Amino acid sequence: MKRIAIGFCLLGLALAGAQQRMADRAGQPGGASADRITREVRHELVMLPYYGVFDNLAYSVNGGTVTLLGEVTRPTLKSDAENSVKHIEGVTNVVNQIKVLPLSPMDDRIRVAAYRAIYSQPGLDRYALQAVPPIHIIVDNGHVTLVGVVASKSDKDMAGVRANGVSGVFSVDNQLQVEGR
């Protein structure tokens, strides 16, 4: 008789746990977890065909709402980012706050010169070997912002110095992050 009572208690606890998990999933659209949505959003953004070193895409996930942030050089990249994220299971709303940088021949010249200055520097040239280099160069009306991740503080400082040495640059905002910090 005791064994039967213990068996029913264990069965009741198992059912209560399963019911709690179902309730947790019901609170999230489609049962999708925030971690899974975050991984899929990152994957979709990195896989965009025209996403490059002169673009910066960021995002935040809050429940089923994905907020897209950053700056891009092509208007089509802004809409492509929104469309690729919209179809992820569990995403109910996409807020697109991506800024399209203005067309400017001078900014284009600065982009190319900054790319050459940074990625031709011994020590920083190893970053250029990746499909999407980790140092993103954002140029907006002559103002350069460096965004991304580097291995050391000296790499961060060197990239800032190299970008600051480009002719026509008004200011450099070095927002590079050092791995592990």
Model-derived segments and spans:
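N-terminal targeting leaders
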Residues: 2-11, 17-181
